[in-house]
UniProtKB/Swiss-Prot annotation:
Name by which UniProt lists this protein: Arsenite methyltransferase
Phosphoserine modified-residue sites: 46
Primary location recorded for the protein, binned into one broad class: cytoplasm
Gene Ontology biological process: arsonoacetate metabolic process; methylation; response to arsenic-containing substance; toxin metabolic process
Organism: Rattus norvegicus
Reactions it catalyzes: arsenic triglutathione + [thioredoxin]-dithiol + S-adenosyl-L-methionine + 2 H2O = methylarsonous acid + [thioredoxin]-disulfide + 3 glutathione + S-adenosyl-L-homocysteine + H(+); arsenic triglutathione + 2 [thioredoxin]-dithiol + 2 S-adenosyl-L-methionine + H2O = dimethylarsinous acid + 2 [thioredoxin]-disulfide + 3 glutathione + 2 S-adenosyl-L-homocysteine + 2 H(+); arsenic triglutathione + 3 [thioredoxin]-dithiol + 3 S-adenosyl-L-methionine = trimethylarsine + 3 [thioredoxin]-disulfide + 3 glutathione + 3 S-adenosyl-L-homocysteine + 3 H(+)
Alphabetic keyword roster: Cytoplasm, Methyltransferase, Phosphoprotein, S-adenosyl-L-methionine, Transferase
UniProt-recorded Gene Ontology molecular function terms: arsenite methyltransferase activity; protein methyltransferase activity; S-adenosylmethionine-dependent methyltransferase activity
Length: 369
């Protein structure tokens, strides 16, 4: 049973996203505005096929679209009006499946209302999308089976939940081994104060419940995930003086991370990997995270954990693997857990620069996430 404070937060969030907000124009901060740039062509085409009401009622940050999705089973946490679900529906194809879950009934009803429309629009024989009304901290209660998904995504939603660890534990349970949680969310530069947490507007707009970014790695390790791998990061500017006074020195960043669930096997050691190319939208270059970019046909030395992720995930057939003897190549140390605020600052210095294709997050330094 949810604690009284948790239950109150759930009620406030449902009211905010179900009744207060009618379109994205009603947001009082810029923390969850969808960016207009940085979207690759194949995703842009898929987005153009989504009904305009579904898009207008969607409040996520950026586009959360990982790579290599053909035939995958994907779960979208906090699917809202279903925008991302309908984009992904086209990318996984008729043999894949998308499940969206959201605790705001009004949003789920919007998503369901256009199920037949999108099935026909995409040229599918039967729908490959299912929408569920439920809480993302209680996936089993919603009927979601253990080890049944290749990928779980979330778009600016986990911050709205009081118990982040409970959400990530549920995600770990429903992922197959080799699967990943690929998600965009808002993170704080320090522990968020009680004044910020208790502010209903700041919570509803993705700031009040933001996790201190270093805590993500602690929670992930406790549950069993590999260390978080940062993909993109962009500074959030609020643009509301009254709310900025409440926030004080606390800064916020939107960041896309990927967390992998790997089988408990002995590490195989460092490897040289060669990307075979051919992944849709990433035929010549795969930007895997902030540390590793793989170009078609080019050998890259990777640490044992990165090698294990590539070997055990849906990317296994996209790479050639060659073991590296310690005596032949000196280890190249990379900091796996990157600071999203530093990456955002580095990215800002390199303007003009957009988020890597298909990776989610936002484009450049914006008044949004």
């Amino acid at each position: 049973m949810a604690a009284p404070r948790d239950a109150e937060i759930h009620k406030d969030v449902q009211n905010y996203y179900g009744n207060v907000l009618k379109t994205s124009a009603d947001l009082q901060t810029n923390a969850c505005v969808t960016p207009a740039k940085g979207v690759p062509e194949y995703i842009r085409k898929s987005l153009q096929n989504v009904h305009e009401e579904v898009i207008s009622r969607y409040y996520g940050c950026g586009l959360v679209v990982p790579e290599h999705l053909e035939n995958c089973r994907i779960l979208d946490l906090g699917s809202g009006s279903g925008r991302d679900c309908y984009v992904l529906s086209q990318l996984v194809g008729q043999k894949g499946h998308i499940t969206g879950i959201d605790m705001t009934k009004v949003q789920v009803e919007v998503a369901k209302a256009y199920l037949e429309y999108h099935t026909e629009k995409f040229g599918f024989q039967t729908p490959n999308v299912t929408f569920l009304h439920g809480q993302i901290e209680m996936l089993a209660e919603a009927g979601i089976q253990k080890e049944s998904y290749d990928i779980v995504i979330s778009n600016c939603v986990i911050n709205l939940v009081p118990d982040k660890q409970k959400v990530l534990r549920e995600v770990y349970q429903v992922l197959k081994y080799g699967g990943e949680l690929y998600f965009s969310d808002v993170y704080a530069s320090l522990e968020v104060s009680e004044d910020i947490k208790s502010h209903k507007v700041l919570w509803g707009e993705c700031l009040g419940g933001a996790l201190y970014w270093k805590d993500l790695a602690v929670i992930a390790k406790k549950i069993g995930f590999c260390p978080p791998r940062l993909v993109t990061a962009n500074i959030i500017t609020v643009g509301n003086k009254e709310l900025e006074r409440v926030l004080g020195d606390c800064r916020f960043v939107s960041a896309t991370f990927r967390l992998f669930k790997l089988p408990k096997t002995e590490p195989a050691g460092r490897c040289q990997v060669v990307y075979n190319g051919g992944i849709m939208g990433h035929e010549k270059e795969l930007i895997f995270d902030a540390n590793f970019t793989f170009k078609e046909g080019e050998a890259v030395e990777v640490d044992e954990e990165t090698a294990a992720i590539l070997r055990n995930s849906r990317f296994a057939h996209d790479f050639l693997f060659t073991p590296v003897e310690a005596s032949l190549l000196a280890p190249q140390t990379k900091v796996i857990i990157r600071d999203p605020f530093k990456l955002a600052e580095e990215s800002d210095k390199m303007k003009p620069r957009c988020a890597p294709e298909g990776t989610g997050g936002c484009c450049g330094k914006r008044k949004s996430c």
